[in-house]
Amino acid sequence: MSPETARPFIDIHAPVAQALAAGRPVVALESTIITHGMPYPDNGAMAANVEKIISDGGAVPATIAVIGGRIKIGLSDGERESLAMTGDAMKLSRADLGFAVAQGRTGGTTVAATMIAAEMVGIKVFATGGIGGVHKGAEKSFDISADLDELARTPVIVVSAGAKAILDIEKTLEVLETRGVPVVGHGCETMPAFWSRQSPFRAPLTLYKPEEIAHFFRTRVALGLGGGVLVANPVPENHEIPAEEMAGYIEAAQKAAEALNVTGKAVTPFLLGKILELTGGRSLKTNIALVENNARLAAEIAKAL
């Protein structure tokens, strides 16, 4: 779908439209973290605060979602709160974004769907928590997130805390390399692992300043290389849960998912919910902290572009 033919299906929130028209920095935000990633009311409060962080950082936030079949680029306070309370929202990626629009449905946009919508309107920077990737046991289940293909195809900078730690990070990095997606550790030479600052794997590339990341992206665009850039930004040290501790929680959550035969799109929300329970709420606090940290960096990158 080209941007021109997509416009009749898109509603751009007035502050976002004004910023785009004036060439001011805009940062996209996804909405599955609202609809599927956190319980209410934490999800709504988190989303509002992340938008404020981006605004305070000198950029305009644009939370992306599908509401009643309309692709929303930026939400009003009422729309954001209503989405946070929606119990039956779809989880939308490239495969079902068009379905939700055609059927008048409401859904949270994954990394992939958010990248698509952002690129349609010219937003080049997007802050999220963690990307999807290769699930553990994918050699049997073939459960690999569409986020990875979208990163290879859509020219958007995605600021994350790496891949979600419930995934097979090593295989996720291998797929990203195969698909030609640059993975940049922000100020780190080791890949972060979502709730934890370090994983056993090296960051393929390292840059230290938002201006360097912006320059790298502009250079890729000028060279016609296509696709996005994944920025891996470690969670602040005072909020991390060490990887050794998280490993036990993740293993227990995965065993519970297997016992209940949880599959497909239900896997990630189930695992996140189980880990929230096992950590006594600590994982949620860390998740919120890392999203806020990514929003701050994304605002700086957007200003540098």
From Swiss-Prot:
<feature type="binding site">
    <location>
        <position position="111"/>
    </location>
    <ligand>
        <name>substrate</name>
    </ligand>
</feature>
<keyword id="KW-0479">Metal-binding</keyword>
<keyword id="KW-0378">Hydrolase</keyword>
<feature type="active site" description="Proton donor">
    <location>
        <position position="30"/>
    </location>
</feature>
<dbReference type="GO" id="GO:0016798">
    <property type="term" value="F:hydrolase activity, acting on glycosyl bonds"/>
</dbReference>
<dbReference type="GO" id="GO:0004730">
    <property type="term" value="F:pseudouridylate synthase activity"/>
</dbReference>
<feature type="active site" description="Nucleophile">
    <location>
        <position position="164"/>
    </location>
</feature>
<dbReference type="InterPro" id="IPR007342">
    <property type="entry name" value="PsuG"/>
</dbReference>
<dbReference type="Pfam" id="PF04227">
    <property type="entry name" value="Indigoidine_A"/>
</dbReference>
<feature type="binding site">
    <location>
        <begin position="145"/>
        <end position="147"/>
    </location>
    <ligand>
        <name>substrate</name>
    </ligand>
</feature>
<dbReference type="GO" id="GO:0005737">
    <property type="term" value="C:cytoplasm"/>
</dbReference>
<comment type="subunit">
    <text>Homotrimer.</text>
</comment>
<keyword id="KW-0456">Lyase</keyword>
<feature type="binding site">
    <location>
        <position position="143"/>
    </location>
    <ligand>
        <name>Mn(2+)</name>
    </ligand>
</feature>
<feature type="binding site">
    <location>
        <position position="91"/>
    </location>
    <ligand>
        <name>substrate</name>
    </ligand>
</feature>
<keyword id="KW-0464">Manganese</keyword>
<keyword id="KW-0326">Glycosidase</keyword>
<dbReference type="InterPro" id="IPR022830">
    <property type="entry name" value="Indigdn_synthA-like"/>
</dbReference>
<comment type="function">
    <text>Catalyzes the reversible cleavage of pseudouridine 5'-phosphate (PsiMP) to ribose 5-phosphate and uracil. Functions biologically in the cleavage direction, as part of a pseudouridine degradation pathway.</text>
</comment>
<protein>
    <recommendedName>
        <fullName>Pseudouridine-5'-phosphate glycosidase</fullName>
        <ecNumber>4.2.1.70</ecNumber>
    </recommendedName>
</protein>
<dbReference type="GO" id="GO:0046113">
    <property type="term" value="P:nucleobase catabolic process"/>
</dbReference>
<comment type="similarity">
    <text>Belongs to the pseudouridine-5'-phosphate glycosidase family.</text>
</comment>
<dbReference type="GO" id="GO:0046872">
    <property type="term" value="F:metal ion binding"/>
</dbReference>
